[in-house]
Amino acid sequence: MYALYIGIFISPIQILVELVEMLQKGLSGFRRYLEVVETEPEIQDKEGAIDLENVKGDVCYDNVSFHYSDDNKTVLSQVSIHIPAGKSVALVGPSGGGKTTICSLLPRFYDVTAGKVTIDGKDVRDLTLKSLRNQIGMVQQDVYLFDGTIRENIAYGKPDATDEEIKEAARRANMDDFIMQLPKQYDTYVGEKGTRLSGGQKQRISIARVFLKNPPILILDEATSALDNESERYIQKSLEELAKNRTTITIAHRLSTIKRSDEIIVITEDG
């Protein structure tokens, strides 16, 4: 009987201790969340920034140098590249040479240390971030999908898109056939980070997003490097369709990905 009373008494205490531990962990996570939310981004609109409108897509890197703020090692040194509107350029070279950094400077994920990057003659630092990034589409190796439906994930490229626009983007990305074979079609849930889809299917959603956004400037950063040969063939057709009449910067190691580029630029380890 004594042991029974002890058990009855201890059980609520154990539950209370577990609740206190959960509360402490939750508070710690919430504090970290607030820190992230309240963090001011380093890259912001300058006073008097203007909107980028009526974009033709002429891109110029003028004597650009760059190093990260926490590292004095130079990543890029006096790089000059001119990409006429509607033309395509491929960047090739060893890993760590600065190819992705070059692409990241265009939408101002980072700012140049010296020199300037321009679109249609306008320094990207003089433009509002929203208008600048609205004119640039990106397809990367790693695709982030939300835990929602295929329809919702495609619409991320243009939140106010109509159902017809979403389906047209999917068709142009060569994914309409596999969607129509799914029981719920466009209302199929993709799972967290797209776990219910193959690598090729996830990449096609990423491409459909850009078709929907319809930007004049396109960045393809190792878009097919993680795919098998069969998936790459399907994706490559979609990418070629996507790049038509757009200023395109492609980073890739496979010849099949860059062979149609108007110009190939080799980036060395010294940037």
Stretch-by-stretch model annotation:
Residues L23, E40-I43, L242:
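Signal-transduction coiled-coil helices of two-component systems
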Residues Y2-A3, V37, I136, I154:
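A general structural motif at alpha-helix termini
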Residues K46, L52-G271:
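ABC-type nucleotide-binding domain
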Residues E35, E42, A155:
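Conserved E/DxxT/N motif and adjacent residues on the DHp alpha2 helix
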Residues T39-E40, Y110:
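Two-component histidine kinase transmitter core
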Residues M1-F9:
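Small-residue-enriched core segments of transmembrane alpha-helices in multipass membrane transport
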Residues I8-V36:
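Cytosolic ends of transmembrane helices, especially the final helix of ABC transmembrane type-1 domains
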